[in-house]
């Protein structure tokens, strides 16, 4: 293949030959040399454009056209301009037949070629070897000059005029090319060459043969580009106006500042007011110093500077915090006790603790406020008790929910360097309440999380520590603030999710689930009167409750530790009773039968008490978040080889209790019953298999069931038991005694076996229940078996300590 240096002589005469070819009649051969274009330009018929030729294959095609095809060459675009040595697959199928008008050589050995587009054509196949040489087919179409074509030409011309108004790419005089053109095909090609768009869109226009279709596509492209240019111009205008406005404001502000300086430095009204506020109020000295420093910064800034807004916001915060303002605590202990009892029934321990604090404050103003944590199941009144405490103490009340909190800045605030920085929620509450000694409830403290944004539980360590919160520093405020007079009350459902360091700073008061007796009293004296007070007319003329109806709702329609569901069910009954009263015009007395009518069948499907003593079946007691419940343990022997089968969806701890109970049972029964363990499999099952169960407190119950099934002795059905066991047969204390005793009482079981060390917990059981119960306190499993497996069910145990539940019995 020849190179550029070899062809210097040949191309020196190209310009002369081009001039000669223009004077001759155009004749288009069927086979033409082809130049592959890799610029972003598409040559259309009926247009005159220049382009550059530099590659060897293009120079050879140009030479071929000048010498053999009467200066006619086929120009086709590459699909990818980056391809240096293209093949047929790199080219579009449709190109333009052009006539060479002029060829000029450039200093860099490339040639500038001026051509005139003659016709659009598509190549059939390549017959060249060293360069592209295509068999071509000219693309023609027949059309008449219809009104539609004339309208399209007019619309394209108008749209081009619009485009030229917004774009600087096309000189206005260029549109003169279209003024005298009445041939639609020529008009469409010239318009296409002026039309904006990328290489793909231009190639599509070239491939559209019919002028009407070509004009429609040109119209679409022009309309789109004109709209975009119009939007760009509008945006540019807005930006320009803003810049001019900003410059004008800056000029006027500077001018005003100079005038003020000349007149003797007259202070800004806002700054003057801030200075007066600092001097006229009793702020701590360190607050005044900080405020003065910030005001000095503000004076040196432009009033409209972004930093000035940050300083103003900061000054607003530190000057509006209650540095000294506080409410006076009530010194009437009887009044405080009355308020607490009005709002809540029971809850003696938290009430007593608040009254103790008030009594201490009455004689010593230096008494530190306790950090109280109420722990208990949902709905038992933890949050509402905190509100009552504030009312009883004559303090303002604020609540902050910690559930799901993961960002430390929610407690400590953001540093002022951050955009949109704000103080933490503790300081926000203090400012909102306007006093430095409110009651603040930190709700759901057990449900905080940890994330990459920090650990909010660790941030609370300073807040809830009486030794540190005297000088609590919020990241935004940056000044020490005394939180020691704030009474913090926290609530939680469980303790184990609270970090030990945080738990150690709080005085934990457990609020257990309400008993049925307490629920009845609350429903009768709190819930129903509250509902009645919401009626416009006298509620006692519309409905009334029988005590038996309230008890039916408690026992058969609610199973919860608190009273939220109980209130919902009572409200449902009241709504239906009110509707009946309005329809009939008579007062509705709500009886148990009416409860069934209004609420439907019983929602609580509780298993009945065992009808008679049974072999291998014992009644245990369990604690759940909804209160206490009875738990039946079943065991049986089946032929086998000493295996153990455990069913009932038991957790790992309870499974371990079963294995301990089995080992202990084998030890208790001795060699006399050894064959029963080796020739049988033992199956232990806890009914209600869909409910997960876990914990060690069923140890004595399982052991009793196993000994019963091996010895073939029935277990008394009038006794319930709870307690953890060891391999030595010791009975260890367990939790939830109050709830478990109440569960036995509800079931009609009035004799309960408990660990000896749980005897002190009996005092927590309501006296009305305690006096009706009999408790046997045991230290070993043998004492349990003496009572539970006594063949004479009426015979009292000779071992273990048994007493009636009178609170005075010791």
Swiss-Prot record:
Molecular function terms from GO: ATP binding; ATP hydrolysis activity; ATP-dependent peptidase activity; sequence-specific DNA binding; serine-type endopeptidase activity
UniProt-annotated binding residues for ATP: 376-383
InterPro entries registered for this protein in UniProt: AAA+_ATPase, ATPase_AAA_core, Lon_bac, Lon_bac/euk-typ, Lon_lid, Lon_proteolytic, Lon_Prtase, Lon_prtase_N
Active-site residues annotated for this sequence: 697, 740
Subcellular location: Cytoplasm
Domain of life: Bacteria
Residue ranges of domain Lon proteolytic in the record: 612-791
Induction: By heat shock.
Ranges where the Lon N-terminal domain occurs: 32-226
Key words of the record: ATP-binding, Cytoplasm, Hydrolase, Nucleotide-binding, Protease, Serine protease, Stress response
Nucleotide-binding in keyword set: yes
A GO CC term assigned to this protein in UniProt: cytoplasm
One record GO biological process: protein quality control for misfolded or incompletely synthesized proteins
Recorded catalytic activity of this chain's protein: Hydrolysis of proteins in presence of ATP
EC number(s) stated in the UniProt entry for this protein: 3.4.21.53
NCBIfam families, sorted: lon
Biological role: ATP-dependent serine protease that mediates the selective degradation of mutant and abnormal proteins as well as certain short-lived regulatory proteins. Required for cellular homeostasis and for survival from DNA damage and developmental changes induced by stress. Degrades polypeptides processively to yield small peptide fragments that are 5 to 10 amino acids long. Binds to DNA in a double-stranded, site-specific manner.
UniProt subunit comment: Homohexamer. Organized in a ring with a central cavity.
Family in the record: Belongs to the peptidase S16 family.
Protein name (Swiss-Prot/TrEMBL): Lon protease
Lineage, highest ranks first: Bacteria, Thermotogati, Thermotogota, Thermotogae, Thermotogales
Record gene name: lon
């Amino acid at each position: 293949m020849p190179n550029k240096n070899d062809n210097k002589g040949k191309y020196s005469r190209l310009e002369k030959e081009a001039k000669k070819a223009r004077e001759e009649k155009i004749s288009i051969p069927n086979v033409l040399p082809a130049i592959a274009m890799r610029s972003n330009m598409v040559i259309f018929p009926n247009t005159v454009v220049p382009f550059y030729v530099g590659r060897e294959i293009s120079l050879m095609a140009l030479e071929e056209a000048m010498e053999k095809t009467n200066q006619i060459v086929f120009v086709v675009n590459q699909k990818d301009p980056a391809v240096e040595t293209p093949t047929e697959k790199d080219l579009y199928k449709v190109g333009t037949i052009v006539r060479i008008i002029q060829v000029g050589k450039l200093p860099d050995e490339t040639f500038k070629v001026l051509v005139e587009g003659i016709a659009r054509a598509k190549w059939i196949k390549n017959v060249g070897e060293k360069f592209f040489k295509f068999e071509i087919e000219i693309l023609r179409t027949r059309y008449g000059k219809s009104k539609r074509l004339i309208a399209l030409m007019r619309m394209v011309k108008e749209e081009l005029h619009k485009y030229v108004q917004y774009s600087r790419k096309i000189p206005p005089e260029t549109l003169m090319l279209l003024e005298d053109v009445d041939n639609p095909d020529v008009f469409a090609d010239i318009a296409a060459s002026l039309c904006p768009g990328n290489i793909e869109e231009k190639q599509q226009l070239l491939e559209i043969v019919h002028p009407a279709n070509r004009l429609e596509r040109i119209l679409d492209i022009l309309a789109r580009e004109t709209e975009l240019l119009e939007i760009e111009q509008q945006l540019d205008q807005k930006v320009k106006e803003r810049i001019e406005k900003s410059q004008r404001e800056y000029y006027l502000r500077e001018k005003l500042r100079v005038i003020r300086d000349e007149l003797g430095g007259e202070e800004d009204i806002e700054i003057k007011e801030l200075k007066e506020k600092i001097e006229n109020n009793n702020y701590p000295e360190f607050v005044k110093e900080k405020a003065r420093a910030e005001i000095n910064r503000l004076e040196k800034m432009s009033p409209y500077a972004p930093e000035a807004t940050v300083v103003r916001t900061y000054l607003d915060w530190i000057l509006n915090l209650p540095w000294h303002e506080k409410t006076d605590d009530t010194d009437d202990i009887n009044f405080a006790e009355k308020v607490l009892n009005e709002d809540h029934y029971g809850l003696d321990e938290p009430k007593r603790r608040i009254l103790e604090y008030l009594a201490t404050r009455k004689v010593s103003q230096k008494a530190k406020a306790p950090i109280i944590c109420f722990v208990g199941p949902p709905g038992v009144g933890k949050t509402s008790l905190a509100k009552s405490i504030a009312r009883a103490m004559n303090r303002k009340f604020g609540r902050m929910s910690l559930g799901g909190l993961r960002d430390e800045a929610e407690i400590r605030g953001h540093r002022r360097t951050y955009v949109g920085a704000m103080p933490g929620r503790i300081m926000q509450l203090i400012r909102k309440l306007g006093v430095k000694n409110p009651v603040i409830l930190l709700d759901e403290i057990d449900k905080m999380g940890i994330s990459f944004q920090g650990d909010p539980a660790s941030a609370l360590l300073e807040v809830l520590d009486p030794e540190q919160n005297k000088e609590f520093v919020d990241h935004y405020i940056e000044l020490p603030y005394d939180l020691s007079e704030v009474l913090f009350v926290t609530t939680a459902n469980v303790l184990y999710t609270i970090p030990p360091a945080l738990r150690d700073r709080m005085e934990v008061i457990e609020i257990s689930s309400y008993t049925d007796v307490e629920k009845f009293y609350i429903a009768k004296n709190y819930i129903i009167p509250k509902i009645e007070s919401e009626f416009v007319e006298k509620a006692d003329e519309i409905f009334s409750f029988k005590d038996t109806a309230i008890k039916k709702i408690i026992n058969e329609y609610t199973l919860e530790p608190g009273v939220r569901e109980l209130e919902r069910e009572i409200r449902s009954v009241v709504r239906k009773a009110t509707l009946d009263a309005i329809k009939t015009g008579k007062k509705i007395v709500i009886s148990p039968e009416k409860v069934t009518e209004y609420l439907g069948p019983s929602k609580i499907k509780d298993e009945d008490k065992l009808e008679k003593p049974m072999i291998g079946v014992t009644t245990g007691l369990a604690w759940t978040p909804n209160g206490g419940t009875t738990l039946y343990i079943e065991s049986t022997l089946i032929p086998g080889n000493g295996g153990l089968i455990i069913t009932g969806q038991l957790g790992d701890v309870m499974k371990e209790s079963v294995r301990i109970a089995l080992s202990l049972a084998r030890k208790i029964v001795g060699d006399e019953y050894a064959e029963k363990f080796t020739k049988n499999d033992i199956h232990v099952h806890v009914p209600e298999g869909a409910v997960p169960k876990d914990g060690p407190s069923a140890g004595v119950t399982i052991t009793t069931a196993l000994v019963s099934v091996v010895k073939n002795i029935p277990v008394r059905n009038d006794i319930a038991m709870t307690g953890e066991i060891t391999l030595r047969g010791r009975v260890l204390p367990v939790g939830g005694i109050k709830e478990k005793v109440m569960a036995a009482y509800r079931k009609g079981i009035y004799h309960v076996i408990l660990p000896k060390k749980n005897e002190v917990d009996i005092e927590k059981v309501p006296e009305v229940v305690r006096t009706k119960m009999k408790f046997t306190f045991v230290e070993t499993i043998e004492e349990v078996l003496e009572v539970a497996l006594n063949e004479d069910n009426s015979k009292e145990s000779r071992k273990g300590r048994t007493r009636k539940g009178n609170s005075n019995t010791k």
